[in-house]
């Protein structure tokens, strides 16, 4: 009887294991890189909302990088996203002039760019 009980428990436990293991694996088909210029409460909330929305779509991954009003770091982060080959780049520029060339670089490489919060000094982005 004891062996039978163990076998009865083993089958549901293994089923549960396989079910949870399959839920944790997500194939990423669309990568979004987000470059934030600062990390105040408003932007924290925005980041959390973007991450939450991405959970509703299988295969979507959002990578958010935040700088603390540092143009050089933001340029480095955007270049990282370009090298990683993101499918969409979302940028909140710290300042327009320093960030414009790297956003143009992403655009010229065929990466769609969404600029928000402030514009850059170029028209090489499809959405503001």
Q: PLM features: residue spans?
A:
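Bacterial carbohydrate/catabolite-sensing allosteric modules
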Residues: 26, 55-58, 127-128
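Short hydrophobic/aromatic-rich motifs at helix boundaries and adjacent loops
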Residues: 21-26, 48-51, 74-75, 115
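Basic side chains
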Residues: 2-3, 43, 65, 118
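Short, low-complexity disordered leader/linker segments with a strong preference
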Residues: 1-30, 104-111
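Flexible loop/hinge segments that line or gate small-molecule binding clefts
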Residues: 96-128
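Composition-driven detection of intrinsically disordered, low-complexity segments
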Residues: 12, 79, 122-124
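Extracytoplasmic "Venus flytrap"
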Residues: 31-53, 57, 62-80, 84-86, ...
